[in-house]
């Protein structure tokens, strides 16, 4: 459940601190309440995440639009991290066993992957890439996970694995 509903809740919470939500204070007033240093760090990291998504081809000659999907990509990653931390905190001191050959951490990430699974036609991929502020389901899963160290540890991801992303290329906004 943490990998599914926990991620959705964390996603919505993170919108308060994404590229749009960060411009509003606790009362909903549009105001710059961040320090210049914090804003600069955020913008630099957010730009790296947008660029990372924009490098991905979703079809022949067509790339994802990391600028258009930035807020949702930040929220997806933030929701994933918030939920994972809550999951690990709830499990402290408990013996959690493998089920069907999967560790608790692996099941968390599998739950996350199932949340955004899609089976869509190529024409829909193109349409969504042009109009949707959400990344395609495959990117919401794979690209978010490729940036999260706990995913590498859970599945023992190695440099030769398809999901591997070099540590210096990984981007974590929050």
Predicted features and spans:
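Zinc-dependent metallohydrolase catalytic domains
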Residues: 1-6, 16-174
């Amino acid at each position: 459940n943490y990998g599914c509903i926990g991620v959705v809740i964390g996603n919505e919470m993170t919108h308060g601190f994404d590229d749009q939500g960060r411009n509003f204070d606790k009362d909903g007033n549009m105001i710059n309440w961040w320090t210049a240093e914090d804003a600069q760090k955020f913008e630099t990291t957010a730009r790296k995440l947008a660029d990372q998504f924009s490098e991905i081809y979703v079809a022949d000659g067509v790339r994802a639009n990391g600028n258009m999907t930035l807020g949702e990509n930040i929220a997806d990653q933030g929701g994933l991290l918030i939920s994972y931390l809550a999951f690990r905190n709830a499990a402290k001191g408990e013996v959690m066993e493998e089920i069907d050959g999967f560790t608790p951490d692996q099941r968390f990430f599998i739950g996350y992957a199932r949340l955004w699974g899609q089976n869509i036609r190529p024409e829909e991929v193109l349409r969504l890439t042009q109009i949707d502020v959400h990344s395609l389901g495959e990117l919401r899963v794979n690209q978010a996970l490729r940036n999260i160290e706990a995913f590498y540890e859970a599945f023992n991801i190695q440099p030769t694995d398809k999901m591997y992303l070099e540590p210096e290329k990984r981007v974590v906004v929050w």
